[in-house]
Amino acid sequence: EDQLIRVENIKGTIQADFIGGNEQNNTLDAFRGDGNTLIGSGGDDVLLGSSDGNDTFKAGILKSDGSLIDGNDGNNTIDGKFGTNNTLDYSAYASGRTISVDMGDLDGTGNSTVTISDGTTDKIKNIQNIIGGAGADTIIGNSQNNSLVGGAGNDIIKGVAGDNQLLGGAGNDTIYSGTGNDFIDGGEDNDTVSFEAATGDITVSLTTTTAQAVGGGMGTDTITNIENVIGSSHNDTISGNSGINTLIGGAGNDKFVATKGSDTYYGGILAGTTHTVANGESNSVDYSNASKVYVDLSSTTTDANGNNYSQALKSNSSTNDGFSSNIESTDSLYGIANIKGSSSFDTLIGNELSNTLEGMAGDDILEGKGGDDVLEGGDGNDTFIATSHNDGKDTIDGGTGNDTIDYSKLGSSNAINITLAEADIYATVTVTSGDNDIVKNIENVIGTAG
């Protein structure tokens, strides 16, 4: 074992070397070999990788026992040279120190800049992988196959091109999928995956932990330990899991597939922003996985940002016992116009928009409210309720079973006239001084008070 005194610069061997600097301005050169570890300490250091291997560069001060502590105050220059799997490791940094780096943002000499919250910067080149510290780091990859690890803290991690490993670690992280085939692991706490960069429709399911083809130019990703999803500006299909999820569709006509848990669905709106739902938006939630659901889109609550949302009550009972008990969870629906029910006794109520409400199997109650609605009963003995004489020109299909349209809420001056047609043939319901409906597969009619 050699002791080096008053030495600032070291060149390694052809083996896998471990080279640590001191408080001086060091030049540490791995030279040759695979698996070298170079540690810059207190000075403005130059760390050079080997010519024929993959090396690890660590930021921090080396203690006498070989461990690292936070405190590398230098402005370092780090070049991985010829390796294709070099790693820059900031895991020694404590929570009060953060890093920010965009590996694809190069200066005129081909270097990327790591900006550190203490005011120092590192210039890096030929680095493929970065490990963050305990702070809230921002790590953006490049066109290569990157491994980006946030560590502790609420990190932002962005994959670009290449087949990447994007790992959040502890903290509430936001991970952006890239265009390659990425492995995305949120780690601990409440994490979000974003597909905002997609160029087309995406389909993502948090219940699928194996590789899934996302679409929209985003490759085939493996997603695990993720609670929340941000979609694209296109027509997305997003499914949660059994946890508490927040699913954000963004622009486009999005479909959310509901699962267990008290979830929040944002159609055409980003969380924390203000948005007014416009007629013509066609965001939907699919409750076909639920035991039973009650949704009233016309009943809303206003959040702190001024956005209105409706609630969906999900029951753990599939019997016709109402919704006063056996409520498993409650979802919050932002910007949702269309609902698909479960296979049992659902109640689906629309709003002033042109809604599509699908009862599916079971004896369902469907009420369109305003707008030109499409109401489909599916299997079972369904009831369709007209709210008023001017509640829109609705299209109603009872489906199979013994189905009823109910106009009893209309006033005495709003008589209806209908002759029921054969199965699968539409008949017109004429409403005096009101909006006419077209209906098919209806067996029973309840008239108005007129």
Language-model-derived ranges and their functions:
Residues T13-Q15, T120, G133-G135, S232-N235, ...:
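Extracellular acidic loop/turn motifs
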Residues L4, T121-I124, T220-I223, T330-L333, ...:
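Short loop/turn positions that demarcate and connect the beta-strands within blades
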Residues E1, T77, T138, T347, ...:
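Short, intrinsically disordered, charge-balanced linker/junction segments flanking boundaries
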Residues N172, N381, T400, I438, ...:
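Thr-biased low-complexity repeat/linker tracts and other Thr-enriched repetitive architectures
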